[in-house]
């Protein structure tokens, strides 16, 4: 019986808690394993209930048969006897008090062993799911005091919101997916032509582009979809490496410098025996020095990659590449002046035009965090400072949400409705530019997507989720605290590749400037109340200027 009990506990542990192979399992396997674990748990629970019922019925039947036969030796209730034997002892044995004590110790040991296994299993589960959220956070979002929602009274109905979306947003972005696909294809064509031109030059190499921003993340409104941002990663040529020197984020700016240096495999690998390194051999050192010196002279300032020089070099490359591929397209391409991005303007004969911004980026390690050439709005950087960008990480997160969420979810509609109204909002008197930006609303939405199950974002819940989004941002304004979605977010799925230090870092407050500037905070609150007024009068007030 002891061996059977131990084997039963081991089988139960293996069935309920399969061993995890790696922290970074792919998403499909993760979803299937969770579904299988849930189904097996339900089946095991049902089998345990049936086993207990059958055991109880068999025991009662046996007692009844013994009673009618007059055999009451095993009936403790009739005889008032107490079985002092060890629970796992054979019926013919009598262990006495010592056996009873050993039996209790055996049961206690098995219980402790099972408890240790359970604690270890819980400590090994670090992978957060989109559907999972802590109880405290879920209560924080879903169980809100009634007084907190008083300023959301008179909110439009589901039908009114759907009607607004259909007439003012859906038609305006109908062709957006096809346009995004064309933009990426066109930029890839230009990059391939640039590679042909730069084969014999010791200059940075261009990798495949990645569309980022509102248009490619499918939440852009008419105003946001007039421009397309495309990230173009660059890597050093052979024999050269980029060394990222990050600035101290406590100084208020997240950026870094890209140092250019020579590279050789012998610096990273231990060569066996008396092996000659061709790069560092005196016959090839001149060639290596010439390659590195060429980049430093053309693109660097004090051995660091210069944003302005690098962008100008890239603009010249694109201009020359256009001459190779112009015969494929039926539009006119111009390059408006810019110091931090390579801007492209496509003018069609029909009068339609597209604006594309090519942003250069240097990848941080094996993550989707890049040091980019384009600085955020309202911030000034030196020519050797490359701002840190999380656009690729956020793009991946929203893409994964769309993959795992039910069909026809409303999370992007919530953002589009708010931004459509904000685009046609008049600024408060004396204000030169808005305080609340589309990135603030997008950040609030991504926080809610992690805290609420994806099943709560179904199409019929548009009105409730829009209220949640406005409440979340309104509470953040009251507290003057809106945390960055990626930095210091311990609930971020491990499938989003960011530097490990970011997960355990202190959260970054995007509203820190509102703490230091009461005037800006007052303007942000006024903008928010104006937005609420627009939402509440949505059914009966067309947008100024139309869409």
Curated annotation (Swiss-Prot):
Database matches in Gene3D superfamilies: 1.10.1410.40
Protein's recorded name: Inositol 1,4,5-trisphosphate receptor-interacting protein-like 1
Signal peptide start and end residues: 1-16
Pfam family, one: Mab-21_C
UniProt subcellular location: Cell membrane
Cellular component annotations (GO), alphabetically ordered: membrane; plasma membrane
BP-aspect Gene Ontology terms: negative regulation of T cell receptor signaling pathway
Family: Belongs to the ITPRIP family.
Membrane topology: Single-pass type I membrane protein
Main location: membrane
Residues that span the membrane, as ranges: 97-117
Coiled coil stretches, renumbered: 28-66
PANTHER family: CELL FATE DETERMINING PROTEIN MAB21-RELATED, INOSITOL 1,4,5-TRISPHOSPHATE RECEPTOR-INTERACTING PROTEIN-LIKE 1
The entry's keywords: Cell membrane, Coiled coil, Membrane, Signal, Transmembrane, Transmembrane helix
Lineage: Eukaryota, Metazoa, Chordata, Craniata, Vertebrata
Domain of life: Eukaryota
Cytoplasmic side: 118-547
Extracellular side of membrane: 17-96
One function term, GO molecular function aspect: receptor ligand activity
Job description of the protein: Functions as a ligand of CD3E, inhibiting TCR-CD3 complex signaling to regulate T cell activation. Induces stable CD3E-NCK1 binding, thereby preventing the CD3E-ZAP70 interaction and subsequently inhibiting the activation of the downstream ERK-NFkB signaling cascade and calcium influx.
């Amino acid at each position: 019986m002891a061996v059977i009990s131990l084997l039963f506990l081991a089988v139960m542990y293996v069935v309920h808690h399969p061993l995890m192979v790696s922290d970074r399992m792919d998403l499909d396997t993760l979803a299937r394993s969770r579904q299988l674990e849930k189904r097996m748990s339900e089946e095991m629970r049902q089998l345990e209930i049936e086993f207990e019922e059958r055991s109880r019925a068999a025991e009662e039947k046996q007692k009844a048969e013994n009673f009618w036969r007059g055999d009451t030796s095993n009936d403790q209730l009739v005889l008032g006897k107490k079985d002092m034997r060890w629970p796992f002892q054979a019926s013919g044995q009598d262990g006495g008090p010592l056996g009873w004590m050993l039996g209790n110790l055996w049961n206690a040991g098995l219980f402790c062993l099972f408890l240790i296994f359970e604690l270890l299993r819980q400590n090994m589960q670090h992978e957060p799911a989109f559907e999972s959220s802590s109880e405290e956070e879920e209560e924080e979002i879903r169980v809100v005091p009634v007084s907190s929602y008083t300023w959301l009274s008179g909110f439009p109905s589901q039908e009114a919101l759907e009607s607004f979306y259909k007439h003012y947003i859906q038609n305006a972005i109908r062709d957006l997916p096809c346009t995004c696909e064309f933009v990426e294809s066109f930029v890839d064509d230009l990059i391939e032509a640039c590679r042909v031109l730069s084969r014999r030059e010791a200059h940075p190499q261009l990798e495949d582009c990645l569309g980022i921003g509102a248009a490619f993340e499918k939440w852009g409104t008419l105003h946001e979809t007039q421009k397309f941002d495309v990230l173009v990663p660059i890597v050093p040529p052979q024999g050269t490496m980029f060394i990222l020197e990050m600035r101290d984020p406590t100084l208020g700016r997240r950026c870094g410098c890209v140092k250019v240096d020579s590279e050789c495999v012998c610096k990273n690998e231990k060569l066996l025996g008396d092996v000659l390194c061709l790069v560092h051999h005196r016959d090839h050192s001149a060639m290596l020095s010439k390659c590195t010196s060429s980049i430093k002279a053309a693109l660097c300032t004090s051995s660091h990659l210069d944003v302005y020089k690098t962008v100008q070099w890239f603009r010249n490359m694109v201009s020359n590449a256009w001459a190779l591929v112009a015969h494929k397209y039926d539009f006119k391409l111009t390059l408006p002046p810019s110091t931090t991005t390579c801007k492209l303007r496509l003018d069609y004969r029909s009068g339609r035009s597209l604006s594309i911004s090519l942003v250069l980026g240097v990848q941080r390690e094996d993550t989707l965090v890049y040091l980019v050439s384009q600085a955020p709005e309202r911030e000034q950087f030196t020519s050797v400072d490359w701002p840190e960008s999380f656009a690729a990480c956020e793009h991946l997160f929203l893409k994964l949400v769309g993959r795992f969420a039910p069909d026809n979810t409303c999370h992007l509609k919530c953002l589009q409705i708010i931004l459509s109204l904000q685009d046609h909002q008049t600024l408060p008197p004396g204000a030169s530019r808005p305080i609340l930006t589309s990135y603030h609303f997008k950040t609030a939405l991504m926080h809610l997507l992690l805290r609420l199950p994806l099943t709560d974002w179904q199409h019929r819940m548009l009105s409730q989720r829009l209220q949640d989004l406005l409440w979340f941002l309104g509470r953040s304004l009251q507290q003057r605290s809106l945390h960055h979605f990626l930095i210091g977010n311990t609930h971020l799925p491990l499938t989003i590749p960011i530097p490990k230090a970011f997960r355990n870092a202190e959260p970054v407050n995007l509203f820190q400037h509102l703490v230091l500037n009461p005037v800006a905070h007052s303007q942000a609150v006024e903008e928010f109340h104006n937005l609420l007024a627009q939402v509440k009068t949505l059914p009966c007030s067309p947008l100024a200027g139309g869409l």
